[in-house]
């Protein structure tokens, strides 16, 4: 039986946006502004950006908010929240928003592994899960996917939203393969030696997408595409070898599904995250676009290239983690988060990122995934190990 989404008394979808001040969260609020007759924001969370939280809560008259970072739970600006707004503090308070009776759909736009428990809370509370946090499935897909009813989890990543839509009305058993598209990042065509000398500013200059800092670096290393392959194998119930990566520099084809008869379904559109965000809210309907339309007369050419796994080692490491399975993707993800954070704070070089990740993976004894507690322990171990590798590299 397919999942049945609930709606508010006035027919609007009541939305919780977890991570409302990040790139995805702010674009989700744009969608809610455009479709105020169809969407009602009933819960918001931030990590520490309390001023922005208050501004959004006031604009949308939100009845409940949460601040994940306890150090900001007493920020004076929170006194300016609308009268009667409930305030929770800490990671569990964020999860409680996903369980509220006045929430129909939970957009998990929290960066990193912190989104896993919020995603779990949404699924077990019978909410539609609009999932923008790929780490939830990379780390905990073995635990989350058995909980998701058909149609309950709608991916927000542009590529996975594209694949999801290419499967609509089709028999998944007749699919031959998935073509997961990749922009190639800002360093497409560079050599490994050239990557040794790229700067933070170079890496943050993505050619086609406007994103947060962490995912922009992941896109530059191609770790983002590696994580997306692992996410796709959980979402679509296939092996990693079923999912091919192809570089599509213009980022206009968001992914493709090739079927047994040789037909290929491709999803095209503007490079604007508001489109997949809106689809996760509107499904099974389609609403007026929140973004400029694609004019094929002005598009020019579409190009396709193979991804270079020898130069972009993170893509190969993610493939290794995905094929190994178990707790290895958790280690991959945690070590990468630590290494990317170090790079963003000038604590390591660009190519140190994959070296740190590989060292942590080499040191890990893979286990079958059994619980969220186990994943928390593995995550903590990998972060500590990554910090030690970084310290040894730069001592």
Segments (PLM) and residue ranges:
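Catalytic, metal-anchored helix/loop core of enzyme active sites in primary metabolism
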Residues: 1-395
